Amino acid sequence: MTNRVLVIASGNAGKIREFSNLLQELPLQVNPQPDGIQVEETGITFRDNALLKARAVAEATGHWALADDSGLSVDALGGAPGVYSARYANSDPERIERLLKELGDRTDRQARFSAALCIAAPDGSVLAAVEGYCEGSITFSARGTQGFGYDPVFEVKNSGLTFAEMTQDHKKQHGHRGRAFALLKPELEKLLENDPGQDAGATPIP
């Protein structure tokens, strides 16, 4: 029996690499999202947007789809950028520049990354949905060359390192996606045990 196909519902190369690394131990054929799929992120929470993306990509491809919606919430900015993290500016450097400019020289720089993960089937049913968090703070300047997005300016609590200064294994252990995936993995393993190689629906999760 061939391994089940799981499509990563993202066009972000950094996310695809990170999820491929997280999923490498499971009996899955991990595929990137095909070109041309656009999903409007109209949800008001990270979970809402993850559900929208997973359902849309699963329906479009005919395979299970794993989506995440993640973002950075900064206390001193009232939780911004939040669900608008990816739309805060046009590119990663511009998003970081805007964030640092808005924080200025404030000393209250507490922040957290959130990640909602969702797996959906082609019929629109939700097979699993979890959320993970990582506490930290915003640095005064970018540090490190690994990662993507806000990684260079987010220092993980009690680590002394930004995400961009961590190895993939270190980030897997401490990062919000890694923590969310730790919750998702046993659910995904159970799904694969019960239905390893054919697409099927499931009882929807509200």
Swiss-Prot record:
Mg(2+) binds at E40, D69. It comes from the Bacteria. GO terms for cellular component: cytosol. Its cofactor is Mg(2+). Substrate binds at S10, G11, N12, A13, G14, K15, S70, F148, G149, Y150, D151, K171, H176, R177. Binds 1 Mg(2+) ion per subunit. It catalyses: XTP + H2O = XMP + diphosphate + H(+); dITP + H2O = dIMP + diphosphate + H(+); ITP + H2O = IMP + diphosphate + H(+). InterPro entries: dITP/XTP_pyrophosphatase, ITPase-like_fam, RdgB/HAM1. The active site is at D69. Keywords: Hydrolase, Magnesium, Metal-binding, Nucleotide metabolism, Nucleotide-binding. The keyword Oxidoreductase does not apply. One of its GO terms (molecular function) is nucleotide binding. One of its GO terms (biological process) is nucleotide metabolic process. The keyword Chaperone does not apply. Homodimer. Belongs to the HAM1 NTPase family. PANTHER family: INOSINE TRIPHOSPHATE PYROPHOSPHATASE, INOSINE TRIPHOSPHATE PYROPHOSPHATASE/HAM1 PROTEIN. Pyrophosphatase that catalyzes the hydrolysis of nucleoside triphosphates to their monophosphate derivatives, with a high preference for the non-canonical purine nucleotides XTP (xanthosine triphosphate), dITP (deoxyinosine triphosphate) and ITP. Seems to function as a house-cleaning enzyme that removes non-canonical purine nucleotides from the nucleotide pool, thus preventing their incorporation into DNA/RNA and avoiding chromosomal lesions. This is dITP/XTP pyrophosphatase.
